[in-house]
Amino acid sequence: MKVIPAIDLMDGQVVRLRRGKAKDKTVYSDDPVKVALTWEKDGADMLHIVDLDATLGRGNNIDMIRNITDAVSIPVEAAGGLRSIDLVAGALEGADRVVLGTLAFRDRDALREILESYGSKKIVISVDHVKGKIMVDGWRENTGINLVDAMQGFVGAGFTEFLLTDVDRDGMMQGPETDTLGKVCRMSDSHVIASGGITVPGDVKSVRDAGAWGVILGKALYEGKVSVKGAISC
């Protein structure tokens, strides 16, 4: 299973939010490149970089993301605010792949064009949910779309890479919800990355046993509860 540290960027800093709320922010570093190099040195398989300012429509961290992708040699996936074909194209000039959430649910024509242009391995569909219902727009809008139905539709359309985030558990350090994860992983041979709730090393094993292809390490990593090396050895 791939071990993937998250680097969430806001105002050029590495931060973590609780349940995606900007007012509930903790700053962990003023040097995102140094953080990225640390996780790479520790053995991370990939980096998951989220531009929270772009997600929330309050600017972007494009230059900082470019600095990170220039500095590391491991793959980088970029997420946050990629809601147009042009923004996706720009992100892929530096990142190895992009994570699409709001665009995937609101603009199927653009999504189809992106798939045709870049192929399924470059596109990660973000299926963020609260109690099995899809959330978009920086987790501010509940679409009412059923998670399993959405996954089946995307798999049928040719997508193979997914990021599953349990919004209620993100940044809360309450442990992952593995029942839904297991159900989603059993649906197809697609790659599913689990995100949200990882708190102790045993949680990493739990999501691996549920069938996850990868796991995002967020707040627990920055709080010292889980290490990259420890997650790899689980």
Swiss-Prot record:
It is found in: Cytoplasm. Pathway: Amino-acid biosynthesis; L-histidine biosynthesis; L-histidine from 5-phospho-alpha-D-ribose 1-diphosphate: step 4/9. Its EC number is 5.3.1.16. Belongs to the HisA/HisF family. It comes from the Archaea. It catalyses: 1-(5-phospho-beta-D-ribosyl)-5-[(5-phospho-beta-D-ribosylamino)methylideneamino]imidazole-4-carboxamide = 5-[(5-phospho-1-deoxy-D-ribulos-1-ylimino)methylamino]-1-(5-phospho-beta-D-ribosyl)imidazole-4-carboxamide. Its main location: cytoplasm. One of its GO terms (molecular function) is 1-(5-phosphoribosyl)-5-[(5-phosphoribosylamino)methylideneamino]imidazole-4-carboxamide isomerase activity. Keywords: Amino-acid biosynthesis, Cytoplasm, Histidine biosynthesis, Isomerase. GO terms for biological process: L-histidine biosynthetic process; L-tryptophan biosynthetic process. It is an enzyme of class 5 (isomerase). This is 1-(5-phosphoribosyl)-5-[(5-phosphoribosylamino)methylideneamino] imidazole-4-carboxamide isomerase. The active site is at D8, D128.
